Protein backbone atom coordinates (compact mmCIF):
# COMPACT_ATOMS: atom_id res chain seq x y z
CA UNK A 1 0.00 0.00 0.00
CA UNK A 2 1.48 3.31 -1.06
CA UNK A 3 1.90 5.89 1.65
CA UNK A 4 0.20 8.63 -0.34
CA UNK A 5 -2.05 8.67 -3.35
CA UNK A 6 0.10 10.79 -5.65
CA UNK A 7 -2.36 10.24 -8.49
CA UNK A 8 -5.24 11.89 -6.63
CA UNK A 9 -4.32 15.34 -5.37
CA UNK A 10 -7.80 16.15 -4.08
CA UNK A 11 -7.96 12.96 -2.03
CA UNK A 12 -4.64 13.88 -0.41
CA UNK A 13 -5.75 17.45 0.32
CA UNK A 14 -9.11 16.47 1.83
CA UNK A 15 -7.55 13.56 3.72
CA UNK A 16 -4.92 15.83 5.23
CA UNK A 17 -7.53 18.40 6.27
CA UNK A 18 -9.71 15.64 7.68
CA UNK A 19 -6.79 14.35 9.73
CA UNK A 20 -6.09 17.80 11.18
CA UNK A 21 -9.70 18.35 12.22
CA UNK A 22 -10.11 14.82 13.53
CA UNK A 23 -6.90 15.03 15.57
CA UNK A 24 -8.34 18.11 17.28
CA UNK A 25 -11.65 16.35 17.93
CA UNK A 26 -9.88 13.30 19.34
CA UNK A 27 -7.92 15.53 21.72
CA UNK A 28 -10.95 17.52 22.89
CA UNK A 29 -11.56 15.30 25.97
CA UNK A 30 -8.05 15.96 27.33
CA UNK A 31 -9.28 18.64 29.81
CA UNK A 32 -11.93 16.21 31.03
CA UNK A 33 -9.41 13.46 31.73
CA UNK A 34 -6.99 15.94 33.28
CA UNK A 35 -9.80 16.81 35.67
CA UNK A 36 -10.41 13.09 36.35
CA UNK A 37 -6.73 12.53 37.12
CA UNK A 38 -6.57 15.60 39.34
CA UNK A 39 -9.68 14.70 41.34
CA UNK A 40 -9.00 10.95 41.15
CA UNK A 41 -12.63 10.26 40.34
CA UNK A 42 -14.67 9.89 37.14
CA UNK A 43 -17.60 11.74 38.75
CA UNK A 44 -20.65 11.37 36.49
CA UNK A 45 -18.81 10.55 33.27
CA UNK A 46 -19.39 7.28 31.42
CA UNK A 47 -16.97 5.11 29.47
CA UNK A 48 -19.40 4.03 26.75
CA UNK A 49 -18.53 6.85 24.28
CA UNK A 50 -14.84 5.98 24.47
CA UNK A 51 -15.37 2.23 24.14
CA UNK A 52 -17.60 2.79 21.12
CA UNK A 53 -15.10 5.22 19.61
CA UNK A 54 -12.30 2.68 20.02
CA UNK A 55 -14.36 -0.04 18.36
CA UNK A 56 -15.24 2.27 15.48
CA UNK A 57 -11.58 3.24 14.98
CA UNK A 58 -10.60 -0.44 14.99
CA UNK A 59 -13.19 -1.25 12.32
CA UNK A 60 -12.13 1.61 10.05
CA UNK A 61 -8.47 0.76 10.52
CA UNK A 62 -9.17 -2.83 9.48
CA UNK A 63 -11.10 -1.55 6.46
CA UNK A 64 -8.19 0.74 5.51
CA UNK A 65 -5.78 -2.20 5.49
CA UNK A 66 -7.87 -3.79 2.75
CA UNK A 67 -7.67 -0.72 0.48
CA UNK A 68 -4.93 0.96 -1.52
CA UNK A 69 -3.73 4.55 -1.26
CA UNK A 70 -5.62 5.31 1.95
CA UNK A 71 -2.66 6.06 4.22
CA UNK A 72 -4.44 9.12 5.65
CA UNK A 73 -7.31 6.87 6.67
CA UNK A 74 -4.81 4.65 8.47
CA UNK A 75 -3.14 7.54 10.32
CA UNK A 76 -6.29 9.05 11.80
CA UNK A 77 -7.73 5.74 12.97
CA UNK A 78 -4.39 4.53 14.33
CA UNK A 79 -4.23 7.71 16.40
CA UNK A 80 -7.86 7.15 17.38
CA UNK A 81 -7.10 3.66 18.69
CA UNK A 82 -4.10 5.00 20.61
CA UNK A 83 -5.78 7.99 22.26
CA UNK A 84 -9.03 6.15 23.06
CA UNK A 85 -7.04 3.37 24.73
CA UNK A 86 -5.39 5.99 26.94
CA UNK A 87 -8.75 7.56 27.81
CA UNK A 88 -10.24 4.18 28.72
CA UNK A 89 -7.19 3.25 30.81
CA UNK A 90 -7.49 6.48 32.80
CA UNK A 91 -11.22 5.92 33.25
CA UNK A 92 -10.72 2.38 34.52
CA UNK A 93 -7.99 3.53 36.92
CA UNK A 94 -10.21 6.10 38.66
CA UNK A 95 -13.72 4.68 38.15
CA UNK A 96 -15.86 3.10 40.84
CA UNK A 97 -15.92 -0.69 41.02
CA UNK A 98 -19.30 -0.85 39.28
CA UNK A 99 -18.26 1.48 36.46
CA UNK A 100 -14.93 -0.32 36.10
CA UNK A 101 -16.61 -3.73 35.75
CA UNK A 102 -19.08 -2.37 33.20
CA UNK A 103 -16.23 -0.92 31.14
CA UNK A 104 -14.29 -4.20 31.21
CA UNK A 105 -17.39 -6.14 30.16
CA UNK A 106 -18.00 -3.76 27.25
CA UNK A 107 -14.38 -4.06 26.13
CA UNK A 108 -14.48 -7.85 26.25
CA UNK A 109 -17.84 -8.08 24.49
CA UNK A 110 -17.43 -5.42 21.81
CA UNK A 111 -13.77 -4.58 21.28
CA UNK A 112 -12.36 -8.04 21.83
CA UNK A 113 -15.14 -10.54 21.14
CA UNK A 114 -17.00 -8.59 18.46
CA UNK A 115 -13.93 -7.40 16.59
CA UNK A 116 -12.20 -10.80 16.71
CA UNK A 117 -15.35 -12.45 15.35
CA UNK A 118 -15.52 -9.98 12.46
CA UNK A 119 -11.81 -10.38 11.81
CA UNK A 120 -11.92 -14.19 11.71
CA UNK A 121 -15.04 -14.40 9.55
CA UNK A 122 -13.76 -11.85 7.03
CA UNK A 123 -10.27 -13.32 6.87
CA UNK A 124 -11.35 -16.92 6.31
CA UNK A 125 -14.68 -16.59 4.50
CA UNK A 126 -13.99 -13.67 2.15
CA UNK A 127 -11.16 -12.60 -0.11
CA UNK A 128 -9.98 -9.53 -2.02
CA UNK A 129 -12.60 -6.96 -2.95
CA UNK A 130 -15.37 -9.04 -1.41
CA UNK A 131 -13.71 -8.81 1.99
CA UNK A 132 -13.30 -5.03 1.65
CA UNK A 133 -16.98 -4.67 0.73
CA UNK A 134 -18.11 -6.73 3.71
CA UNK A 135 -15.94 -4.79 6.14
CA UNK A 136 -17.01 -1.50 4.56
CA UNK A 137 -20.65 -2.47 4.95
CA UNK A 138 -20.11 -3.28 8.62
CA UNK A 139 -18.39 0.09 9.14
CA UNK A 140 -21.24 1.94 7.45
CA UNK A 141 -23.89 0.07 9.45
CA UNK A 142 -22.14 0.79 12.73
CA UNK A 143 -21.64 4.43 11.78
CA UNK A 144 -25.31 4.92 10.91
CA UNK A 145 -26.34 3.46 14.27
CA UNK A 146 -23.98 5.80 16.11
CA UNK A 147 -25.21 8.79 14.09
CA UNK A 148 -28.69 8.27 15.53
CA UNK A 149 -27.40 9.28 18.98
CA UNK A 150 -27.89 13.08 18.61
CA UNK A 151 -31.55 12.66 17.63
CA UNK A 152 -32.68 12.73 21.27
CA UNK A 153 -31.04 16.10 21.92
CA UNK A 154 -32.45 17.47 18.64
CA UNK A 155 -35.92 16.41 19.76
CA UNK A 156 -35.42 18.14 23.11
CA UNK A 157 -34.24 21.36 21.43
CA UNK A 158 -37.33 21.42 19.21
CA UNK A 159 -39.76 20.79 22.07
CA UNK A 160 -38.15 23.12 24.60
CA UNK A 161 -37.08 25.73 22.04
CA UNK A 162 -33.82 25.94 23.97
CA UNK A 163 -30.29 25.37 22.65
CA UNK A 164 -28.68 25.30 26.09
CA UNK A 165 -27.75 21.66 25.67
CA UNK A 166 -26.46 21.78 22.09
CA UNK A 167 -23.16 23.72 21.82
CA UNK A 168 -22.92 25.51 18.47
CA UNK A 169 -19.11 25.24 18.28
CA UNK A 170 -19.27 21.45 18.60
CA UNK A 171 -21.99 21.14 15.96
CA UNK A 172 -20.05 23.40 13.60
CA UNK A 173 -16.79 21.48 14.03
CA UNK A 174 -18.40 18.10 13.47
CA UNK A 175 -20.30 19.36 10.43
CA UNK A 176 -17.12 20.70 8.84
CA UNK A 177 -15.40 17.42 9.61
CA UNK A 178 -18.21 15.46 7.97
CA UNK A 179 -17.99 17.63 4.84
CA UNK A 180 -14.21 17.16 4.58
CA UNK A 181 -14.41 13.37 4.95
CA UNK A 182 -17.33 13.26 2.54
CA UNK A 183 -15.22 15.04 -0.07
CA UNK A 184 -12.36 12.65 0.71
CA UNK A 185 -14.63 9.67 0.09
CA UNK A 186 -15.91 11.18 -3.16
CA UNK A 187 -12.36 11.90 -4.33
CA UNK A 188 -11.48 8.25 -3.73
CA UNK A 189 -14.81 7.13 -5.18
CA UNK A 190 -15.31 5.15 -1.97
CA UNK A 191 -18.99 4.92 -1.08
CA UNK A 192 -18.23 3.37 2.31
CA UNK A 193 -16.29 6.44 3.41
CA UNK A 194 -18.62 8.97 1.80
CA UNK A 195 -22.07 7.67 2.76
CA UNK A 196 -21.85 7.89 6.59
CA UNK A 197 -20.63 11.47 6.29
CA UNK A 198 -23.65 12.43 4.21
CA UNK A 199 -25.75 11.56 7.25
CA UNK A 200 -23.26 13.35 9.48
CA UNK A 201 -23.49 16.50 7.39
CA UNK A 202 -27.30 16.47 7.35
CA UNK A 203 -27.56 16.04 11.13
CA UNK A 204 -24.85 18.62 11.76
CA UNK A 205 -26.54 21.15 9.47
CA UNK A 206 -29.87 20.48 11.17
CA UNK A 207 -28.34 21.18 14.59
CA UNK A 208 -26.89 24.50 13.39
CA UNK A 209 -30.20 25.52 11.82
CA UNK A 210 -32.01 24.73 15.06
CA UNK A 211 -29.43 26.75 16.97
CA UNK A 212 -30.05 29.81 14.79
CA UNK A 213 -33.85 29.39 14.95
CA UNK A 214 -34.08 28.98 18.73
CA UNK A 215 -31.12 31.11 19.83
CA UNK A 216 -33.23 34.07 20.93
CA UNK A 217 -36.21 32.11 22.18
CA UNK A 218 -37.29 32.39 25.79
CA UNK A 219 -38.53 29.19 27.37
CA UNK A 220 -40.11 28.77 30.80
CA UNK A 221 -37.79 26.80 33.04
CA UNK A 222 -40.53 24.37 34.04
CA UNK A 223 -41.01 23.37 30.38
CA UNK A 224 -37.30 22.73 29.99
CA UNK A 225 -37.26 20.67 33.18
CA UNK A 226 -40.24 18.62 31.99
CA UNK A 227 -38.68 17.87 28.63
CA UNK A 228 -35.35 16.95 30.20
CA UNK A 229 -37.11 14.47 32.45
CA UNK A 230 -38.90 12.97 29.47
CA UNK A 231 -35.68 12.70 27.50
CA UNK A 232 -33.79 11.37 30.52
CA UNK A 233 -31.05 13.90 29.97
CA UNK A 234 -30.13 15.00 33.52
CA UNK A 235 -26.92 13.60 34.90
CA UNK A 236 -26.33 11.25 32.00
CA UNK A 237 -24.02 11.22 29.03
CA UNK A 238 -25.34 11.77 25.54
CA UNK A 239 -23.40 10.02 22.82
CA UNK A 240 -22.95 12.37 19.90
CA UNK A 241 -21.29 11.16 16.81
CA UNK A 242 -17.79 12.32 16.41
CA UNK A 243 -17.95 12.78 12.73
CA UNK A 244 -14.45 13.87 12.29
CA UNK A 245 -12.76 10.54 12.73
CA UNK A 246 -13.49 7.82 10.33
CA UNK A 247 -14.24 5.86 13.47
CA UNK A 248 -17.46 7.08 12.55
CA UNK A 249 -17.65 8.79 13.91
CA UNK A 250 -16.57 8.90 17.47
CA UNK A 251 -19.23 9.79 19.91
CA UNK A 252 -18.92 12.75 22.22
CA UNK A 253 -20.14 12.50 25.77
CA UNK A 254 -21.92 15.57 27.01
CA UNK A 255 -22.84 15.61 30.67
CA UNK A 256 -25.77 17.89 31.37
CA UNK A 257 -26.30 19.32 34.84
CA UNK A 258 -29.69 20.80 35.52
CA UNK A 259 -30.08 24.25 37.03
CA UNK A 260 -32.96 25.79 38.95
CA UNK A 261 -32.41 29.18 37.37
CA UNK A 262 -34.85 30.72 34.89
CA UNK A 263 -34.15 29.56 31.31
CA UNK A 264 -33.10 32.11 28.77
CA UNK A 265 -31.36 31.01 25.60
CA UNK A 266 -28.85 33.79 26.08
CA UNK A 267 -28.10 32.78 29.70
CA UNK A 268 -26.43 29.47 30.42
CA UNK A 269 -28.35 27.59 33.09
CA UNK A 270 -26.33 24.43 32.81
CA UNK A 271 -22.72 23.40 32.92
CA UNK A 272 -21.89 21.34 29.87
CA UNK A 273 -18.90 19.03 29.99
CA UNK A 274 -17.64 17.91 26.60
CA UNK A 275 -15.98 14.54 26.49
CA UNK A 276 -15.07 12.10 23.83
CA UNK A 277 -16.62 9.59 21.95
CA UNK A 278 -16.53 10.92 19.27
CA UNK A 279 -18.18 10.66 18.44
CA UNK A 280 -17.38 10.07 16.05
CA UNK A 281 -17.25 6.45 12.47
CA UNK A 282 -14.51 9.14 13.37
CA UNK A 283 -14.46 10.28 13.37
CA UNK A 284 -15.40 10.70 11.11
CA UNK A 285 -17.29 8.63 9.28
Curated annotation (Swiss-Prot):
Disruption phenotype: Under high-light conditions, plants lacking both SWEET11 and SWEET12 are defective in phloem loading and display slower growth, mild chlorosis, and high levels of starch and sugar accumulation in leaves. In plants lacking SWEET11, SWEET12 and SWEET15, severe seed defects, which include retarded embryo development, reduced seed weight, and reduced starch and lipid content, causing a wrinkled seed phenotype. Altered sucrose efflux involved in the transfer of sugars from seed coat to embryos thus leading to starch accumulation in the seed coat but not in the embryo.
PANTHER family from the UniProt entry: BIDIRECTIONAL SUGAR TRANSPORTER SWEET12, RAG1-ACTIVATING PROTEIN 1
GO molecular function, one term: sucrose transmembrane transporter activity
Stretches assigned to the Extracellular side: 1-9, 65-70, 127-133, 189-192
One Pfam assignment: MtN3_slv
Tissue note: Expressed in leaves, especially in phloem. Expressed in developing seeds.
GO biological process, one term: embryo development ending in seed dormancy
Function per UniProt: Mediates both low-affinity uptake and efflux of sugar across the plasma membrane. Involved in phloem loading by mediating export from parenchyma cells feeding H(+)-coupled import into the sieve element/companion cell complex, thus contributing to the sucrose migration from sites of synthesis in the mesophyll to the phloem. Contributes to seed filling by triggering sucrose efflux involved in the transfer of sugars from seed coat to embryos.
Organism: Arabidopsis thaliana (Mouse-ear cress)
Keywords assigned: Cell membrane, Developmental protein, Membrane, Repeat, Sugar transport, Transmembrane, Transmembrane helix, Transport
Record keyword Coiled coil present: no
Cytoplasmic side: 31-43, 92-105, 155-167, 214-285
Source organism phylogeny: Eukaryota, Viridiplantae, Streptophyta, Embryophyta, Tracheophyta
Protein name: Bidirectional sugar transporter SWEET12
Keyword field contains Membrane: yes
Domain of life: Eukaryota
GN (gene name): SWEET12
Subunit structure: Forms homooligomers and heterooligomers with SWEET5, SWEET11 and SWEET17.
Listed transmembrane segments: 10-30, 44-64, 71-91, 106-126, 134-154, 168-188, 193-213
Amino acid sequence: MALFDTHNTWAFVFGLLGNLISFAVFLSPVPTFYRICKKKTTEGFQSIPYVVALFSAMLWLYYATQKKDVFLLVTINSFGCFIETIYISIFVAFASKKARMLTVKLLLLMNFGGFCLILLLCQFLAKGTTRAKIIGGICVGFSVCVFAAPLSIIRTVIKTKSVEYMPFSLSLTLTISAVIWLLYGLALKDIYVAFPNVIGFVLGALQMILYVVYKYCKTPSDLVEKELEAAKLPEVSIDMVKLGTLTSPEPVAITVVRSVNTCNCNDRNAEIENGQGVRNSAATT
